[in-house]
Amino acid sequence: MPPKKKGIGGSKKEKTKKSTPEKDDGLTEKYRRSVLDVSVLKEHLALRSGVARQATAVRDELKSQVRDLEQLLSQERSDMKDITADLNRQYKSMETDLQSKADKLEASVDLLEKQLAECQVELKSERELRENTEAEKDAIISDLQSKLDSMERECEKILHGCLDSLLSHLADTRMKWEEQSTVIHQDVKDMLREFGINPLHM
């Protein structure tokens, strides 16, 4: 390495010695700036600490709210489970009741259908019996009417025969009475004449 030049080195020292006040001013400025930076950093750190505390408080509050919500959700799930169980129980009970009622109704329907079939059979039998009875009654009435007509004709014949016989008997009796009356009348006239009485003057 080439030897250092003293002249140059001496001049630098002189320059350094001469620039010491300026260097002090620079250090003062740097110190002032450093103090300012430290103050700003402290304020920034204080602000960050405040924000961190607020964030922590918010986080704790949120955690508390989350715990409350989880408890509420757990309670609601428990309530929902109880409600679901109760609804299932009610549904099964209603289903059992409805099935029982349906079975009873089905049994009632079967019984009513059986009774209806029996009633229809009885009704058919009663209708046939009534029709047969009416037919027999009509036949009896027709037979009685026929007999009555025959008896009426016979009675008319007998009546006419009796009337004819009576009229004939009356005619014969009348003739006999007239003959007897004529004889009696003549006898009376003869008796009157015997007594001298003229029958024409009476």
From Swiss-Prot:
Component of the nexin-dynein regulatory complex (N-DRC), a key regulator of ciliary/flagellar motility which maintains the alignment and integrity of the distal axoneme and regulates microtubule sliding in motile axonemes. Residues 50-161 form a coiled coil. Its main location: cytoplasm. Disulfide bonds: none annotated. Keywords: Cell projection, Cilium, Coiled coil, Cytoplasm, Cytoskeleton, Flagellum. One of its GO terms (cellular component) is cytoplasm. Residues 1-29 are annotated as: Disordered. Component of the nexin-dynein regulatory complex (N-DRC). Residues 11-29 have a biased composition (Basic and acidic residues). InterPro entries: DRC12-like. It is found in: Cytoplasm, Cytoskeleton, Flagellum axoneme. This is Dynein regulatory complex protein 12. The keyword Coiled coil applies.
